[in-house]
Amino acid sequence: IYFPPISTEILQEQLQKSGADPVQALVMARISGGNVRLSRELMQNSNDLMEKLYLLLNACFSSDPTIWNKCIDTIARLKTKDINQMEQLFRCVVLFFRDLLYYSAAKTDEEIIFKNQLNKIDKLSKIYSDADWHACIEHIENTQNYISRNGYLPLQMICMILDIQKSLKGEIYEPFQLRDWTPV
């Protein structure tokens, strides 16, 4: 038996009935992808999740190492506290970059998840018109994978930030492969 995902409108309505802010409820309903349990869990942690999301996004678009260190420290504490919340955070970052990819290609906000950040999405897509948003998403997903496999978190995060910043400039970047070290 297959149960399809619940519509965003129904989830948003349920979250609003439980006392959630309409804009925040819409964002959490869209992030959850039709999963009722996840939407409620995200709503309970929404302020904390959004604060950490903005910190991580700020690090991705900043060249200030103090912001990077604050982000790395936050992610490291989150990993030791609850790895599931860390993975939710990375999923949210991927969704934000997906919104940037979608908006820069389609120039419409119909399918944007982070509607509450539409001005920022518009501004970033104009500032980084040459950005390779898809490569940014790959960098984030790879970093999440490496950290989940016990990669050294500070190194992985710094590499991700630097790789994203190269992709934002539209620089062609080829990821390092292990075979690059082996003699031919």
Regions found by a protein language model. Give the residues of each.
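Amphipathic alpha-helical core segments of compact helical bundles
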Residues: 94-98, 102
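Charged, glycine-rich active-site and insertion segments that engage polyanionic ligands
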Residues: 1-92, 106-184
